[in-house]
Swiss-Prot record:
Catalyzes the conversion of cytidine diphosphate diacylglycerol (CDP-DG) and L-serine into phosphatidylserine. Essential for biosynthesis of phosphatidylethanolamine, one of the major membrane phospholipids. Phosphatidylserine is later converted into phosphatidylethanolamine via the action of phosphatidylserine decarboxylase psd. Associates with the bacterial membrane for its role, which depends on the levels of anionic phospholipids in the membrane. This is CDP-diacylglycerol--serine O-phosphatidyltransferase PssA. Pathway: Phospholipid metabolism; phosphatidylethanolamine biosynthesis; phosphatidylethanolamine from CDP-diacylglycerol: step 1/2. Residues 27-224, 239-451 form the PLD phosphodiesterase domain. The active site is at H138, D169, H357, E385. GO terms for cellular component: cytoplasm; cytosol; plasma membrane. The gene is pssA. SMART domains: PLDc. Disruption phenotype: Shows growth dependency on divalent metal Mg(2+) and significantly reduces the levels of phosphatidylethanolamine. InterPro entries: PGS1 (IPR016270), PLD-like_dom (IPR025202), PLipase_D/transphosphatidylase (IPR001736). Changing I316D: Stabilizes the monomeric form of the enzyme.
């Protein structure tokens, strides 16, 4: 059993977090990507004071164009609006994985700026590390006036369900002046005005090697840049705590670590990529040993955004969903006893050829973590991540919380035995060969740390 002292240490961490009081009527849950798109467009069109869009990317496709056009239109209608977009510096200047870097998102931002003279919608490129593989802007949240529309989604056709296919995420709108001010000021001070951050809608922007030293210093500064605010809520009322972090010792990571053992009945986790840091796996095993329930909802390998159908040309990146499945199979084989007793429930999400991008945690009925953090080594060490921790001690959000989980579970099947998952021997020949080659040179471990 977890000693009283240790449990108190975890609970103490949560109790001491500064909390901002939140009205239950000012929290909206959305349950589908199309609703998220419509809400975002409505909020942009009705904004009175500020629009700050932060995302990994804003893609040059129908979905992304709809958003950028709406931002230009809002600025044209109300020139006094403070409108800004922040995306990852490296991601914006390359093609999609496996495609050449011609006509990139950054080129599109430049064209939009040239086609709209006198309408300033700055797009800032944020370099979290000198190379994309070593860290990206994974901070989430669209701050519009006194609201934060929060999702792990980026902005493109599938995330916005612009056409047939969708990528499933979580979507919440929180109206809270204090929290939106804290997030807006932090983004302005620590990201927008950060060294190494340059406008992508400027054709004369520097090349990455020219700002390498600035990027390194910027990353160092971000490690120490937490939100600083006084809470105004106690531990008995509905509250929100914004969190931000870069690096394994961040307050966000510490909070995730302390949140899990506070489950008295049940912990539920969603992640699209099953590659949990060892420290979180230990937390899960400890909960199971104490008789607590753990539910993990992950995407089926075919619902992974890196999955390549067998009838399409194979690329190395297409091995990733199989590596995640190997991780899950290994995890389940260790814990099959708890699967047999229904104490550990693992669900695989699959809905036709749509993809799964959900992340977050639910601890009992009282805590909810909404985040873009994939709960993997990459999120733990390399990317700039953030989250909003919701404390609901009076269960005021219970109906929405239950509905959200019910809908997430709708397209899932429960894994009853680790052998229900394919083993390497069952994989397509090219995948099998690649994985065995990676294992021979021990590079699979390195890959798991950066993916």
């Amino acid at each position: 059993m977890l000693s009283k002292f240790k449990r108190n240490k975890h609970q103490q961490h949560l109790a001491q977090l500064p909390k901002i009081s939140q009205s239950v009527d000012d929290v909206d849950f959305f349950y589908a990507p199309a609703d998220f798109r419509e809400t975002l467009l409505e909020k942009i069109a009705s904004a009175k004071q500020r629009i700050c869009i932060v995302a990994l990317y804003l893609e040059q496709d129908d979905g992304g164009k709809g958003i950028l056009n709406a931002l230009y239109e809002a600025k044209r209608q109300r020139p006094e609006l403070d409108v800004r977009v922040l995306v990852d510096w490296h991601r914006a200047q390359r093609g999609r994985i496996g495609a050449a870097a011609s006509n990139t998102n950054a080129d599109w931002y430049c064209r939009m700026a040239q086609e709209n003279p006198g309408v300033d919608v700055p797009v800032y490129g944020v370099p979290i590390n000198t190379r994309e593989a070593l860290g990206v802007l994974h901070f989430k949240g669209f701050i519009i006036d006194d609201s934060v529309l929060y999702s792990g989604a980026s902005l493109n056709d599938v995330y916005l369900h612009q056409h047939d296919k969708y990528r499933y995420d979580r979507y919440h709108l929180i109206r809270n002046r204090k929290m939106s001010d804290i997030m807006f000021e932090w983004v302005t001070q620590n990201i927008m005005n950060g060294r190494g951050v340059n406008r992508l809608d400027d054709v004369n922007r520097p090349k990455s090697p020219e700002i390498k030293n600035d990027i390194r210093l910027f990353r160092q500064e971000l490690r120490d840049a937490a939100y600083h605010f006084q809470g105004d809520a106690d531990n008995d009322q509905l509250s929100v705590t914004p969190l931000v972090g870069l690096g394994k010792s961040s307050l966000l990571n510490k909070t995730i670590f302390h949140l899990m053992p506070c489950a008295e009945q049940k912990l539920t986790i969603c992640t699209p990529y099953f590659n949990l840091p060892a420290i979180l796996v230990r937390n899960i095993i400890q909960l199971l040993r104490e008789g607590k329930k753990v539910e993990i909802i992950v995407g089926d390998k075919t619902a992974n955004d890196f999955y390549i159908p067998e009838d399409e040309p194979f690329k190395i990146i297409g091995a990733l969903p199989y590596l995640y499945e190997i991780n899950l199979r290994r995890f389940l084989s260790r814990l099959q006893y708890y699967v047999n007793t229904d104490q550990l429930v693992v669900r695989l999400w699959k809905d036709d050829d749509n993809t799964y991008h959900l992340k977050g945690m639910w601890v009992d009925d009282k805590w909810m973590l909404i985040t873009g953090n994939n709960l993997n080594p990459r999120a733990w060490r390399l990317d700039l991540e953030n989250a909003i921790l919701i404390h609901d001690p009076q269960l005021e959000l219970a109906p929405q919380r239950e509905k959200e989980l019910e809908l997430i579970r709708e397209h899932t099947t429960i894994v009853k035995h680790y052998r229900d998952l394919q083993s390497i021997a069952d994989y397509p020949v090219k995948v099998r060969k690649l994985i065995r080659r990676l294992r021979r040179i021990r590079i699979d471990r390195l890959i798991s740390r950066i993916l």
